[in-house]
Amino acid sequence: MKQATRKPTTPGDILLYEYLEPLDLKINELAELLHVHRNSVSALINNNRKLTTEMAFRLAKVFDTTVDFWLNLQAAVDLWEVENNMRTQEELGRIETVAEYLARREERAKKVA
């Protein structure tokens, strides 16, 4: 596992601090622009929901950005969470490569033959 770094900024934080606050947009106003329920926007901003591809398309349209901008923010957070989750790293450490598996299978076959 690599050394822990600061968690990347979430799409919700970017949305709040780089878009809503500077533009003086309220959650319900953004929800109206996005054609989604207010709770969807609120959950994203409060980091209670991950950004979906569909929402990335909607945000890109509303703010004239790229879909990749939003998806890359979420991907960075997702990668950080996996890389810094000890339990997940332990599980990943038990996974063998296909080359290791094939070598082990070949060794077993030699012993049987």
UniProtKB/Swiss-Prot annotation:
Disulfide bonds: none annotated. SMART domains: HTH_XRE. Residues 27-46 bind DNA. Residues 16-70 form the HTH cro/C1-type domain. GO terms for molecular function: DNA binding. Transmembrane segments: none annotated. Keywords: DNA-binding, Transcription, Transcription regulation. Belongs to the VapA/VapI family. This is Uncharacterized HTH-type transcriptional regulator YbaQ. It comes from Escherichia coli (strain K12).
